[in-house]
Amino acid sequence: MTKSLKHKYVLRLDVHLGSSPVSSLSVVTDSVVGSQSDPLWQWSVLLLSLSHFLLDSERLLSLIKRETYRAHTKCTIVKNVSNNVQTHQYDAFTDPRQYHLT
């Protein structure tokens, strides 16, 4: 009878020492364990989204400014060759020497 009691005690001990039902990959915040990662008020996700939004808006504004600047920086070459006027309009960002007006 003592052998059976020891055997039952060992089985109960094994049951109590089993692994916890919580996922091992969860994030622990505020001393709370959860099965899903849930940052404190989603701040890390919010900051990440905000940084992406700011970077995208800066890129968009720089493109708009550059295109607006290009629109206002058109230059015209006028060359008079024996009473024949040749004109060529080019962007200020390109080298006008590449146009051979003869």
Swiss-Prot record:
This is Putative uncharacterized protein BUD19. GO terms for biological process: cellular bud site selection. Partially overlaps RPL39. Disruption phenotypes caused by deletion of this gene may also be a result of a defect in its overlapping gene. Disruption phenotype: Diploid deletion displays a weak budding pattern phenotype in a systematic assay.
